[in-house]
Swiss-Prot record:
Keyword line: Cobalt, Cytoplasm, Magnesium, Metal-binding, NAD, NADP, Oxidoreductase, Pyridoxine biosynthesis, Zinc
Residues binding substrate: 121-122, 254, 263, 272
EC numbers for this chain: 1.1.1.262
Top-rank taxon: Bacteria
HAMAP family cross-referenced by the UniProt entry: PdxA_Epsilonprot
InterPro entries in the cross-refs: PdxA_epsilonprot (IPR037539), PdxA_fam (IPR005255)
Name of the encoding gene: pdxA
Binding site for a divalent metal cation: 150, 189, 246
Pathway assigned to this chain's UniProt record: Cofactor biosynthesis; pyridoxine 5'-phosphate biosynthesis; pyridoxine 5'-phosphate from D-erythrose 4-phosphate: step 4/5
Family as reported in the entry's similarity comment: Belongs to the PdxA family.
Protein name, per record: 4-hydroxythreonine-4-phosphate dehydrogenase
Length: 307
C-alpha cells in the first residue's frame, strides 16, 4: 500500500522550518510521502549553512526565486518566498495531488513587508476557500479552538455576539466531531453572575443554547471559568475547549503541552496542520530546533485524511 502524500510548505527560510524538515525526513518518510515546496538552490544554501546533507529522496516542488538566506532576520524576500511556498502547496493539495497540507512557521512581519494581505496561514486559507476557517491548537490531552485568533484584545468584546458564535460552535462540532466541548467565559470568573462585566457571558449562554438546539444534543457547556478550566481535575471532565481570545486559550495550553501541540485548520475542504510554534529566529540555523511538534502535525494530518 502506498503512503499518503503530504505537501509541506517550508515557512520562513530565515527561521527553523527547513532545519526541522531536514532533521525529520528520515522519520516521517516511513509514514508518508513528503514533498517540500522549495527550490533546489535555496534548499542547498540552507543545508550548507546547517552543515546538513540533503537526503537523496528529499522530493521537492520547485517554486520561488533564490536569495541570500539571513538566519534569524525579518526579510521582505523571505516573507514573499514563504507565501509562494504556501500558495503552491495549497494548490497542490486542492488539486488532489496530496492528501494533506502541513505548514512550517511563517513570520507575520515578513509577510507584511512582502505585501502579503493576510495575518497568517489560517486567515489566508479562510479567504482562499471562502470559508470561516477555525484555528484549533493542542494535542490529544487538550485541544483549544479560538473564536477570535489574531485580533487585538480591544476588539474582541464586540465580536462576541450570540448569532455568530453559535454558527462558529456548530461549525466547530461538525468539523471536529468532539462530543463534549467547554466554552470559556470572557471576563474574570466568567463574570461571576454579572458582578464583573457580564454582557459577553450573556451572548455566550445564548450561543451555547442555540448551538445545542441546532445539533439536538448537549455538546457545549459553559461559560466555564477560564482560570479553573485548565486544572487537572477540570480537564478530566472536559479537555476540548473554545476560547473567546487567543492568549486566554493558548497561554495555558503551551504551558502544559508546548512540545507536542500542533495547529489544525478546521472547516476547510482540505486537511491542514502545522507546528504550534513560530520561526524561532533566536535559534535559527544553530542546530537546536526541536522536531516533536512537526512530527505530531504530520501524524495528525494523516489521521484526518483517513488514508
Amino acid at each position: 500500500m502506498s503512503l499518503p502524500k503530504i505537501a509541506i510548505s517550508v515557512g520562513d527560510i530565515n527561521g527553523v522550518g527547513i532545519e526541522i524538515a531536514l532533521k525529520s525526513h528520515d522519520e516521517i518518510k516511513n509514514i508518508c510521502s513528503p514533498i517540500y515546496f522549495i527550490n533546489n538552490e535555496l534548499l542547498n544554501s540552507a543545508a550548507n549553512i546547517l552543515k546538513f546533507t540533503v537526503p537523496n529522496d528529499f522530493e521537492i516542488f520547485e517554486c520561488g526565486s533564490s536569495f541570500n538566506i539571513k538566519p534569524g532576520r525579518v526579510s521582505k524576500k523571505s516573507g514573499k518566498f514563504s507565501f509562494v511556498s504556501f500558495e503552491n502547496a495549497i494548490l497542490y493539495t486542492q488539486n488532489k495531488r496530496a492528501q494533506a497540507l502541513v505548514t512550517m512557521p511563517i513570520n507575520k512581519e515578513s509577510w507584511k513587508k512582502a505585501g502579503v494581505p493576510y495575518v497568517g496561514h489560517t486567515d489566508a486559507l479562510g479567504k482562499y476557500f471562502g470559508k470561516n476557517a477555525i484555528m484549533m491548537l493542542g494535542c490529544e490531552e487538550l485541544f483549544v479552538a479560538l473564536y477570535t485568533d489574531h485580533l487585538a484584545l480591544k476588539d474582541v468584546s464586540a465580536k462576541i455576539k450570540a448569532k455568530n458564535l453559535a454558527l462558529f460552535l456548530v461549525d466547530f462540532y461538525n468539523s471536529s466531531k468532539f462530543e463534549n466541548i467547554g466554552v470559556l467565559g470572557f471576563n474574570p470568573h466568567a463574570s461571576d453572575n454579572e458582578t464583573i462585566g457580564g454582557k459577553e457571558e450573556k451572548e455566550i449562554i445564548k450561543a451555547i443554547k442555540s448551538a445545542n438546539n441546532r445539533l439536538k444534543k448537549e455538546v457545549f457547556t459553559g461559560p466555564l471559568v477560564p482560570d479553573a478550566a485548565f486544572t487537572k481535575s477540570s480537564l478530566k471532565r472536559c479537555n476540548r475547549l473554545v476560547s473567546m481570545y487567543h492568549d486566554v486559550g493558548l497561554a495555558p495550553l503551551k504551558a502544559l503541552y508546548f512540545d507536542k501541540s500542533i495547529n489544525v485548520s478546521l472547516n476547510l475542504p482540505i486537511v491542514r496542520t502545522s507546528v504550534d510554534h513560530g520561526t524561532a529566529f533566536d535559534i535559527a540555523y544553530k542546530g537546536k530546533a526541536e522536531t516533536k511538534s512537526y512530527i505530531e502535525a504530520i501524524k495528525f494530518a494523516i489521521k484526518l485524511c483517513d488514508y
